[in-house]
Curated annotation (Swiss-Prot):
Subunit structure: Component of the nuclear pore complex (NPC). Component of the NPC Nup107-160 subcomplex.
Organism: Drosophila melanogaster (Fruit fly)
Pfam families: Nucleopor_Nup85
Coiled coil start-end: none
Main location as per UniProt: nucleus
Entry keyword set: Membrane, mRNA transport, Nuclear pore complex, Nucleus, Protein transport, Translocation, Transport
Spans through the membrane: none
This protein's name: Nuclear pore complex protein Nup75
InterPro entries linked to this entry: Nucleoporin_Nup85
Family: Belongs to the nucleoporin Nup85 family.
GO cellular component, one term: nuclear membrane
Tree of life domain: Eukaryota
Single GO term (MF): structural constituent of nuclear pore
Role, per record: Component of the nuclear pore complex (NPC) that seems to be required for NPC assembly and maintenance. Required for nuclear import of phosphorylated Mad via importin msk. Has no role in classical nuclear localization signal (cNLS)-dependent nuclear import via importin-beta. Facilitates the interaction between Nup93 and sec13 with msk.
Length: 668
């Protein structure tokens, strides 16, 4: 893993080139930047159009950061890590060390599974033919390999906190340097012929330097010369090497190990292996010979590759505080022997862990190209297990604040991705007030792909008491349904948004459409509005007019007449609907059997003169002879004057009939 550099770029269009390739940018929702050409202006610049004004188009470029998680194969990492993160929050700070170790291993298991998927995906034909995607997968493998390697080492040194670390370090080194073990498997399958391979001894030496004693013995036992004295002696040395077991007395183990080490040195000095130079070099490695280990260091790729093996043969009971000194010496030795190799960030971070420099380690961990996946989850685990609290206190590091900041940033990143926003909410929920504020800002910006998703968002907002978010989503859905000509849905979502202006606008559209065409839109939705009509006065009018419409359609003229008069008296009739409402009264007024009484008929005449006539006069003065197009938009109207005369005449006739009937005494 190498350090990444800073890349420079330019827009390259005509305007940008003329402006000297200077740019300006504005952040827009979705972690994007809108870039365009820019010419620097100072206090002495003249306030006039530039020479390029109007000559070339102004192009705006939307720049968005690409991340590893844009690759579908990697999204499972986010979901699985989210589940482990939630489990850790439930455990809190009262869990046992074993439970924290299990959580750590769960995170590492997720990464290892991801690496396997990446390796499989990389070998697929469609990826092999797509260079860009192949490069993305290779980059992801490098990043997650580094994350697993560093997490594993951190777990050994700081979460398990064993007194003796060499056995765990050996497992760590073997897993992250599998080449020698893979080749050893090939040699074992070859049998005696393996000893004729050109890389036979280099593989065996690598196995020893990795501490693979049992595998080395198995490979040597198949050598054609395995029956010779020197090979038997080597087998005995490897077999009899003391290995520390937990609970064993340290002093007794040291005595046994010293005896074994001195005996091995004596056999080397006696020339027992002189006839087999390669085997002698191997045994010298086992004895910790500096010259042989220096030769091995020169062949290593990373400084930490053979360090655990060296400790196994020179300091098998190394404790964590001793590892700091041993690792520093080993790194200096490696740098002297490999001066041509620059120390990459991976080597540096391993060194920081072994040197107990967690401040720098956390700083470098945030530079991994994984959108802070590694550093966020690791810091959260550190915070909960509490074993490093004294270290952070001594170094004046506010661990809770650091954790809060990392989780907040990571959760905000997930919230800006249309595929991962639901995971981001779980992280922001851990950030208390700031997290709630972020959710309130980011939830309405999520691209709504379906009403099902919108319902899920609304439920999430409702659970957190984010009423404004719920209403904002409803407004978006209402406007989208309106644009798609789904007016029933538009009205339903508008009512749920409780936005008076939006409800009024949708109701206005339905009323205007009816007055123009005579067709009532979304009758089922209007019929089921019920008590929600009070969201807007216009919706109240629409609901009540729809009731009148239904009474009229079912020929319940008395109820229709009563409701019509109530609407006229309600003072909530919109100006544009007065003509339609009054025209609706004409069939009722012309009925031979009066449906509207004298008092109500006078009221209708009053509304004609005090409400409709002023509207007509106002529009005549404003639009002249075209006023008919602005006031009388009812589909039943052709001539204004004729309709006005018919309305007055219908009122006069109905008034006469009503007065006669109302003032005639019944015959006894």
């Amino acid at each position: 893993m190498s350090d990444s550099g800073v890349f420079a770029f330019e827009l390259g269009d005509d305007l940008a080139t003329r402006c000297g390739n200077t740019l300006t940018g504005v952040f827009v929702p979705g972690s994007r930047i809108a870039l365009s050409a820019y010419r620097h202006v100072t206090h002495s610049s003249r306030d006039e159009p530039t020479e390029n004004a109007g000559q070339v188009p102004v192009l705006i470029y939307m720049a968005q950061e690409s991340t590893l998680f844009d690759e579908p194969v990697l999204r499972s990492v986010l979901a699985e890590a989210n589940a482990t993160f939630a489990t850790l929050q439930q455990l809190g700070s009262r869990a046992t060390r074993a439970e924290y170790v299990n959580i750590s291993r769960a995170y590492r298991s997720i990464v290892r599974s991801c690496l396997e998927k990446l390796e499989q995906a990389k070998k697929s034909p469609e990826v092999q033919t797509d260079e860009a995607r192949l490069q993305r997968l290779c980059d992801a493998i490098v990043v997650f390999y580094a994350a697993e390697c560093l997490w594993h080492l951190f777990e050994i040194l700081y979460i398990q906190s064993n007194q003796l670390v060499v056995p765990q370090l050996l497992d760590w080194a073997r897993f992250h340097s599998p080449h020698a073990e893979d080749r050893a498997t090939d040699l074992l399958l070859m049998g005696e012929e393996a000893s004729e391979s050109d890389d036979y001894w280099s593989i065996v030496k690598s196995l020893i330097m990795l501490g693979e004693i049992d595998v080395t013995r198995a490979v040597l036992s198949q050598n054609r010369k395995a029956g010779q004295t020197s090979f038997k002696a080597a087998e005995q040395i490897l077999k009899s090497m003391p290995v520390y077991q937990e609970g064993y007395a340290l002093q007794k183990f040291h005595s046994q190990w010293e005896f074994w080490h001195v005996d091995t040195e004596r056999k080397i000095q006696s020339g027992l292996f002189a006839t087999e130079p390669e085997l002698e070099q191997l045994i010298r490695l086992v004895a910790g010979d500096s010259e042989q280990w220096d030769a091995g260091i020169k062949e290593s790729q990373d400084f930490y590759e053979y360090l655990p093996g060296y400790l196994l043969f020179t300091k098998p009971t190394c404790k964590p505080f001793e590892l700091k000194i041993a690792a520093a010496k080993w790194l200096n030795r490696w740098c002297l022997l490999r001066p041509e190799r620059e120390q990459c960030s991976m080597n540096r971070m391993v060194s920081q862990l072994m040197d107990h420099d967690l401040r720098l380690f956390i700083y470098d961990a945030q530079k991994l190209n994984d959108t802070h996946w590694f550093s966020t989850h690791l810091i959260d685990l550190i915070h909960h297990c509490g074993q490093l609290k004294s270290y952070f206190d001594q170094n004046n590091i506010d661990l809770p604040a650091l954790r809060h900041s990392m989780i907040y940033e990571y959760g905000s990143y997930l919230m800006t991705s249309h595929n991962m926003w639901q995971l981001g909410i779980d992280y922001l929920d851990c950030c208390k007030q700031e997290g709630q504020a972020a959710i309130e800002l980011l939830l309405p910006r999520i691209t709504l792909r379906s009403e099902r998703q919108a319902t899920k968002l609304i439920n999430l907002a409702r659970q957190r008491g984010l009423i404004s978010v719920e209403r904002e989503i409803c407004k978006v859905l209402s406007k989208r349904s309106y644009d798609n000509e789904r007016y029933g849905n538009a009205l339903e979502w508008a009512i749920r948004s409780k936005d008076v202006l939006l409800v009024t606008a949708v109701a206005d559209f339905i009323l205007k459409h009816y007055s123009k065409t005579g067709c009532m839109l979304c009758p089922d939705t209007i019929a089921n509005v019920g008590g929600r009509m009070f969201a807007s006065p216009r919706l109240v009018f629409l609901s009540k007019y729809f009731e009148f419409y239904e009474f009229y359609r079912t020929r319940d003229f008395l109820s229709a007449s009563e409701l019509l008069v109530n609407l006229l008296e309600s003072k909530i009739t919109p100006d544009y609907f007065w003509p339609s409402l009054l025209i609706d009264s004409m069939p009722l007024l012309e009925s031979k059997d009066p449906k509207i009484f004298a008092k109500e008929t006078v009221a209708i005449l009053h509304h004609i003169e005090t409400d409709l006539v002023p509207i007509i006069e106002r529009d005549v003065s404003k639009y002249g002879k075209h006023h008919t197009e602005t006031v009388f938009k009812d589909y039943r109207v052709e001539n204004v004057d004729e309709i006005m005369n018919l309305l007055r005449l219908a009122c006069a006739r109905n008034l006469a009939r009503a007065l006669i009937i109302e003032n005639t005494l019944p015959v006894v």
